[in-house]
Amino acid sequence: MVMAMAEDLSTAQNREKQHDMDLDIPAKDRLIVALDVNNLDEAMGLVNELGDTVSFYKDGFELMLHAGLEPVRMLKLHRRKNVFFDLKMDDVKETIIKAMRGMVELGVDIVTIHGNGDTAKAALEGRGTSPRPKIVQITYLTSLDGDDLRDLG
């Protein structure tokens, strides 16, 4: 029994090592730190504090509404960091296309859109041949519970 458990543990550890090798992503690139603050100084203070231990940051509505696109520019141009722009975009085709072109110009690495097919098509069209930003399509917000979903139909 103990030997079987040891073999199972060894097999699991080997599988985990193989999985880690398959990913081959450094730890600092696996973590995305949310800059869920409302001012540029606080956001950049956190980036400075974390230094080279983190390479990926999430910017969203709160920081964008208070600091504009400056955090993205600072992260990309001055700090050489990766940016996940969590905007959950959903708009008419032309607006999405133009927004995605702007994301490409800014060098955004990941962007979120809402989960409808027209938005996804427009996002892909706007991104063009660029491999970035990666597009994450949100089908529903995780802050909704079962009652909320039933109420929505």
What are these regions (language model features)?
Residues A4-A6, N14-M44:
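N-terminal amphipathic alpha-helix/helix-capping segment at the start of soluble metabolic enzymes
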Residues A27-K28, D91-G153:
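Conserved anion-binding
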Residues L31-L35, Y57-D59, V83-L87, V111-I113, ...:
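Hydrophobic faces of well-ordered beta-strands that scaffold small-molecule active sites
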Residues E49-K58:
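Catalytic domains of carbohydrate-active enzymes, especially glycoside hydrolases
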Residues G51, V72-L77, L124-S130:
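Surface-exposed amphipathic alpha-helices with a cationic face
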Residues K58-I110:
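Metabolite-binding pocket within alpha/beta catalytic cores that recognizes anionic/polar moieties
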